[in-house]
Amino acid sequence: MRRLFSILLSAFLLLGLAPIVNAAGEAVNADRAATDFTASALTTCSENTRFNERASQATTPKDIARFERYSKASCGDDGLPHLVIAATIEPWGALANRHHEGDILIPGHIFIYVAGIIGWSGREYLRASKKTKNPAENEIIIDFALARQCLIKGAAWPVEANKQGRSGDLREKDENISLNGPR
């Protein structure tokens, strides 16, 4: 039953069968009156008066370059760039809408990969330190040689997680988990 549930959950997440929220309707902002917001209300930032006012106040070359880069984006009436991704082609929206992959797809994958490296390296360090003669000391005083080895191994965490998931080594056995503590 657990396996069936995990397969169904994975399929729902992969296929994007979750309800989609539309960004249309009343948008109430604290600094101005309620406006009817849709993606069609956005204009090119280079044509937006509030964006141009903000761009004219740029003083450093870095700020000027940033405003030039943002001038190609879509701005709302507040003069700030907005990211629009069509929800009609989900879950493959970022793949079909290639000019937004630098906004969400690539940074999201990098974040997940780096977070996985950190988590997997920490997990491997704790598992390796349990095999030493004084594991409690290795948790307090970090053995940098062991930590470096675990960090290097952590780069392959997706492959290792898949291997350990198939072999059953990824999860702790139920008999090794205590029920002490608040309930």
Swiss-Prot record:
Region (Disordered): 164-183
Disulfide bonds: none
GO biological process: photosynthesis
Gene: psaF
Origin organism lineage: Bacteria, Bacillati, Cyanobacteriota, Cyanophyceae, Synechococcales
Transmembrane domains' residue ranges: 102-122
Main location: membrane
Membrane disposition: Single-pass membrane protein
Family that this chain belongs to: Belongs to the PsaF family.
Pfam families hit by this protein: PSI_PsaF
Gene Ontology cellular-component annotations: photosystem I reaction center; plasma membrane-derived thylakoid membrane
PANTHER family with a match to the protein in the record: PHOTOSYSTEM I REACTION CENTER SUBUNIT III, CHLOROPLASTIC (PTHR34939:SF1)
Organism in which the protein naturally occurs: Prochlorococcus marinus (strain SARG / CCMP1375 / SS120)
Basic and acidic residues bias locations: 166-176
Signal peptide: 1-23
Protein name: Photosystem I reaction center subunit III
Subcellular location: Cellular thylakoid membrane
